[in-house]
Amino acid sequence: MPKKGKKPKLPLTDEEQLILFQQKLLADEEAAKKKERLLTQFLKDKLAKEEHNSSLNLNKINTQWRTVLREVKTRELHKDIEILSQIFERVVDCKDSVIKSLARDLTEAEEQYAHALRGHLHNVDQLLTLQRRRLSLLEENYNMELEVLTKEFETERKAILDHHDKEIHYLHDVFMAMEQNYVDSEYESKLEFQSMWDDLKNKNLEEKHFLRLQLENVVEDLWRRFQDALKNYTDATEDRKIAFETLKVKDEKSSKEIEVQMKKIQRLQEAISALKGKIVAHSREGEWQNQCIRNDKELVHVQLRKLKIQRTQARTESQENLVKLTLESNATLKALKKVVEKGEKILKLAEICRKFETEEEKVLPFYSSALTPEEQEEVEIQSQEEITEDLAKIMMDYLGMENFWKRYNKVKLEVLSLQHRRLQLLDISSKLREMLKQYLDGISVSDEVLSRLNPLFIVNHKSNLPQLPPSAAQPGGDRGPGGDRRLTYNVIEAAHIASHIL
């Protein structure tokens, strides 16, 4: 078949070209976006892969680094543990030494406490003994004074009872005499009253009979008048009668009360008379007692004056003693202050010197006795001698300082020993310096060396030592061929001597 020919392209219009251009731009833009998305996705994948690889590598590095760090840290920890173990051992040693020193201090403190306790108990026993003696003396004095007071009381009581019995008998006799006088006077009064009563009775009867006869008529007339007056009076004074009856009743009551009061007055008069008698008796007794009291008062005044004089003397003595005591107490306080300051200084020095103590001194701070058996026997013989009480008290006061003086004497001996050793070393040092100087002078040449005598210095076979005469220089040397003695010198080098000495 014949090929179909291509249709000829028709020319595009502007709009179609514009549309085609826009489609092309869109296709290019879409391709660019797709390419960008692919590139972005590739970069993201690559970044994720790199991050994954970096994390793996980091984990590997961290694992290996941890191993290295563990090893380094292990070595450091081993070193630290060794250092800490050494420090711990050193601290333990220090603590052990501190514990030992504290144990020794505790033992010393316990010994000092036991010693102080023994001293305190001994002092308490002495005080108790002294108090018992004082109480026994006071009890004896009290019993003696009680016995004296009892005797005085019994004597005074007996005298008072005797005086009381005498007064009772006297009052009884007086009472009996007064009663007898009263009975006699009463009997006489009754007889006189009876005679007077009879006389008056007879006289009254006679007068009554005469008056009856004389007054019968008058009475009748008066009776009539009285009846009239009575009637008039009764009528006029009925109210007054009632008031009179009331007053009469009151008068009876008052009379009864007066009678009762009279009886009371009589009883009171009797009591007053009895009390007057008692007052007289008591006044006599009181006068006697007042006289005794006056005498006692005079004695008390005399004793009071004596006591005032004694009190004045005692006050003067006490003031003088107080002044002396004040002066002595001030001096004692100053001395004690100095002692306390000295003790504090000793304690401070002891604390400073404690770190310089050796192990032996820390273990055995108090040395044992260094006396020989013979010296120990002499000390025992001297201690067996009689000791006075004052010396015993002084020894008891200074017994607590025994350990202190032991250490003090030990240190004093060590100081003396070190001073002696120092003098020896100074002597040796001076000798060595002298020998060294001689040696240096022998090997060196100077004006000072040339001016001194030196057996080692020889110039042109000549020494600067003076030549001795033959008789003095050759006392026992060998004789020469001509009969003269030859001079012999022993020369020893100073360095050789110094090496042997050092």
UniProtKB/Swiss-Prot annotation:
It is found in: Cytoplasm, Cytoskeleton, Flagellum basal body; Cell projection, Cilium, Flagellum; Cytoplasm, Cytoskeleton, Flagellum axoneme. Its main location: cytoplasm. One of its GO terms (cellular component) is axoneme. Residues 96-160, 252-285 form a coiled coil. Component of the nexin-dynein regulatory complex (N-DRC), a key regulator of ciliary/flagellar motility which maintains the alignment and integrity of the distal axoneme and regulates microtubule sliding in motile axonemes. Plays a critical role in the assembly of N-DRC and also stabilizes the assembly of multiple inner dynein arms and radial spokes. Coassembles with DRC1 to form a central scaffold needed for assembly of the N-DRC and its attachment to the outer doublet microtubules. PANTHER family: DYNEIN REGULATORY COMPLEX SUBUNIT 2, NYD-SP28 PROTEIN. Component of the nexin-dynein regulatory complex (N-DRC). Interacts with DRC1. This is Dynein regulatory complex subunit 2. It comes from Rattus norvegicus. The gene is Ccdc65.
